Swiss-Prot record:
Its main location: nucleus. It is found in: Nucleus; Cytoplasm. WD repeats lie at residues 14-57, 62-101, 104-143, 146-187, 188-227, 230-269, 272-305. This is Superkiller complex protein 8. Component of the PAF1 complex (PAF1C) which has multiple functions during transcription by RNA polymerase II and is implicated in regulation of development and maintenance of embryonic stem cell pluripotency. PAF1C associates with RNA polymerase II through interaction with POLR2A CTD non-phosphorylated and 'Ser-2'- and 'Ser-5'-phosphorylated forms and is involved in transcriptional elongation, acting both independently and synergistically with TCEA1 and in cooperation with the DSIF complex and HTATSF1. PANTHER family: SUPERKILLER COMPLEX PROTEIN 8 (PTHR44090:SF1), WD REPEAT-CONTAINING PROTEIN 61 (PTHR44090). GO terms for biological process: negative regulation of myeloid cell differentiation; nuclear-transcribed mRNA catabolic process, 3'-5' exonucleolytic nonsense-mediated decay; rescue of stalled ribosome; transcription elongation by RNA polymerase II. It comes from Gallus gallus (Chicken). Component of the PAF1 complex. Component of the SKI complex. GO terms for cellular component: Cdc73/Paf1 complex; cytoplasm; euchromatin; nucleus; Ski complex. Keywords: Cytoplasm, Nucleus, Repeat, WD repeat. SMART domains: WD40. Belongs to the SKI8 family.
Length: 305
């Protein structure tokens, strides 16, 4: 029995406002799977994925304004959230308690990402800097300076070597983390870069932009390997599949699309949301996709592996 693409589960009214961010994590100790959602209702919600459904485990309160970005550490034990209140909060996923609140300073920290070793948390800023905080210390350890505009999106490469940032003017920068040097500046888009994602082997970088296009870059040589069109509006999020072959995108055209990175073609489109889809992620095995959007719903889809 091969799995077909299809919607598996729908959590309606998951939040009282638009859901702008989602993450899917797996606890390395006990194997349990967790989905976390961040919403403009100021809340972070922690859901257990069990028996093919989501069960609300915790509602995490603390942010004073909307939550715009969430991530789960690679150990699966800590969640991070950033908000329009300029604070980053770290949460213990086993107790639902806040571990620490980090004042990001007078910056708009729109996007955050755990480093692959879960030791650091990177966040973009409106002054073109990527600030790196220590997860243990909660202090800013160092910054990477793009000398550019407002950074809307960031991503670590899974091998821990690179950090990519996407700015509001469509510029993408790739840093060498070990040296802090700016390796490549990519100018493929003319509009804001909402999201970027590395392939599991860290060889490719996929970018999503308000120009409606998705671009695939060869990281090492900074070559444009492909331009994909298909969404009818802004592309808001992209995430690579653990199978190293597929990636998923979401858009303000209300759709979620699965792409084959090798053939550069769309293999499936989900039209299940009623409004723009802000966040999309794969689970650890690549067999499921989660999406969230302005319709306040969380959707889980089945994917053939």
């Amino acid at each position: 029995m091969t799995t077909q693409y299809g919607i598996l589960f729908k959590q309606e009214q998951a939040h009282d406002d638009a859901i702008w961010s989602v993450a899917w994590g797996k606890n390395k100790k006990n194997g349990s799977e967790t989905v976390i959602s961040g919403s403009l209702d100021d809340l972070v919600k922690v859901w257990k994925w069990n028996d093919e459904k989501l069960d609300l485990q915790w509602t995490l309160e603390g942010h004073q304004l909307g939550v715009v970005s969430v991530d789960i550490s690679h150990t699966g034990s800590i969640a991070a959230s950033s908000s329009l209140d300029a604070h980053i909060r770290l949460w213990d996923l086993e107790t639902g308690k806040q571990i620490k609140s980090i004042d990001a300073g007078p910056v708009d920290a729109w996007s955050l990402a755990f480093s692959p070793d879960s030791q650091f948390l990177a966040t973009g800023s409106h002054v073109g800097k990527v600030n790196i905080f220590g997860v243990e210390t909660g202090k800013k350890e160092y910054s990477l300076d793009t000398r550019g505009k407002f950074i809307l999106s960031i991503a670590y490469s899974p091998d821990g070597k690179y950090l990519a940032s996407g700015a509001i003017d469509g510029i993408i920068n790739i840093f060498d983390i070990a040296t802090g040097k700016l390796l490549h500046t990519l100018e493929g888009h003319a509009m804001p870069i909402r999201s970027l994602t590395f392939s599991p082997d860290s060889q490719l970088l996929v970018t999503a932009s308000d120009d409606g296009y998705i671009k695939i870059y060869d990281v090492q040589h900074a070559n444009l390997a492909g331009t994909l069109s298909g969404h009818g509006s802004w592309v808001l999020n992209v995430a690579f599949c653990p199978d190293d072959t597929h990636f998923v995108s979401s858009s303000s055209d209300k759709s979620v699309k699965v792409w084959d990175a090798g053939t550069r073609t769309c293999v499936h489109t989900f039209f299940d949301h009623q409004d723009q889809v802000w966040g999309v992620k794969y689970n650890g095995s690549g067999s499921k996709i989660v999406s969230v959007g302005d319709d306040q719903e969380i959707h889980i889809y089945d994917c053939p592996v």
